[in-house]
Curated annotation (Swiss-Prot):
Known partners and oligomeric status: Interacts directly with the anaphase promoting complex/cyclosome (APC/C) through the CDC27B and CDC20-1 subunits.
Intracellular or extracellular location(s): Nucleus; Cytoplasm
Alphabetized InterPro entries for the sequence: Patronus
Keyword entries, A-Z: Cell cycle, Cell division, Chromosome partition, Cytoplasm, Meiosis, Mitosis, Nucleus
Position of sequence motif DEN-box: 14-16
Entry remark concerning the domains of this protein: The DEN-box is not essential for the meiotic function.
Listed name of the protein: Protein PATRONUS 1
Gene deletion effect: Reduced fertility when homozygous. High level of gametophytic aneuploidy. Occurrence of split sister centromeres at metaphase I. Pans1 and pans2 double mutants are lethal when homozygous. Increased mono- or divalent ions sensitivity resulting in primary root growth inhibition and increased lateral root density. Hypersensitivity to microtubule-depolymerizing drugs and higher frequency of anaphase bridges under stress conditions.
GO biological processes: cell division; chromosome segregation; meiotic cell cycle; positive regulation of maintenance of meiotic sister chromatid cohesion; positive regulation of maintenance of meiotic sister chromatid cohesion, centromeric; regulation of mitotic cell cycle
PANTHER family per UniProt: NEURON NAVIGATOR 1-LIKE-RELATED, PROTEIN PATRONUS 1
Motif (D-box): 46-49
C-alpha cells in the first residue's frame, strides 16, 4: 500500500503544505519517541549505509554542527528593514532611473535621430500644405486614346453578345459531325527554328 507522504505529494501542492507537514512530522516524532523508548530493541538504532564507524560520539558532533548551521542560516534570513531603508534611499533610485530615461529615450531617439529641427520641418510643411489647399485649381483630366481600343472600335464586324448555353448550341455532339470544315496545309519553313 502507498505511503501517506507519497499520496500527499501527488496532490497539487499549495504554499502552506511544507509547514503543515513539518508540524505533523514533529508531532508524530514526539509520539513515536515515547513508544520507541518503551519497546527498545537490542542492538540499537539502525545506522546509515554510508556510516562505517563504530563510534557514536561522531554522530553527536555532526548533529551539533548541523544545528549551528541552521541557526546561522536563520539569522541570515532575517532582514533588518529599518537598516535597509537607512542604507538605500529609494528617491535617489527614482531620479537615476528618470535620468536614464531622459538620456537614452529622448525625443531624438523617438523621432528617428532628426533632432529638434524636425518640429520646424513639420511646421513649414504644414504651412505649405495649407497654402496649396487655398489654391484649389485642378486641371481637367485628358482622355487618352489607347491603340488597342481604337483598333477594336474600327473593326467592321458588329458586336455580339456571348452565346447562351441553351439557345444556339446543338443538343448533341453528333450534330457537329455534319458541319463543313476546311483545312489547308502550309509548307514547312526552316526559319522558325
Amino acid at each position: 500500500m502507498a505511503n501517506m507522504n507519497a499520496l500527499q505529494q501527488m496532490i497539487f501542492p499549495d504554499e502552506n503544505a511544507p509547514i503543515h507537514r513539518k508540524k505533523s512530522v514533529t508531532a508524530a516524532s514526539v509520539k513515536s519517541k515515547g513508544t520507541v523508548l518503551g519497546q527498545k530493541k537490542p542492538g540499537g538504532a539502525r545506522k546509515a549505509l554510508n556510516d562505517i564507524t563504530n563510534k557514536s560520539g561522531i554522530h553527536a558532533k555532526a548533529a551539533a554542527s548541523s544545528k549551528n548551521k541552521q541557526i546561522a542560516s536563520a539569522a541570515v534570513k532575517e532582514i533588518d528593514i529599518a537598516g535597509e531603508r537607512f542604507l538605500h534611499d529609494h528617491s535617489k533610485c527614482i531620479k537615476e532611473q528618470q535620468n536614464l530615461w531622459d538620456d537614452h529615450y529622448s525625443a531624438d531617439l523617438m523621432l528617428l535621430h532628426h533632432g529638434s529641427s524636425i518640429k520646424e520641418k513639420h511646421l513649414n510643411w504644414d504651412i505649405e500644405k495649407m497654402d496649396a489647399k487655398d489654391d484649389l485649381t485642378y486641371e481637367e483630366p485628358e482622355e487618352m486614346a489607347s491603340p488597342k481600343f481604337s483598333d477594336w472600335l474600327k473593326n467592321s464586324t458588329p458586336w455580339r453578345s456571348p452565346i447562351r448555353h441553351g439557345s444556339m448550341m446543338p443538343s448533341t455532339p453528333l450534330a457537329w459531325r455534319f458541319d463543313s470544315c476546311e483545312f489547308t496545309l502550309k509548307e514547312d519553313s526552316d526559319d522558325l527554328f
